[in-house]
Swiss-Prot record:
Coiled-coil region(s): none
Subcellular location: Secreted
Protein name in UniProt: Septenin 1k
Role of this protein: May act as an antimicrobial peptide.
Family membership: Belongs to the Frog skin active peptide (FSAP) family. Septenin subfamily.
Record key words, sorted: Secreted
Length: 17
């Protein structure tokens, strides 16, 4: 998905926690 939310990457919906 697109990097919209804070902590989210432009990769395949990978959330950086």
């Amino acid at each position: 998905d697109d990097a919209v939310a804070d902590g989210e990457h432009a990769i395949s919906g990978v959330v950086d926690s």
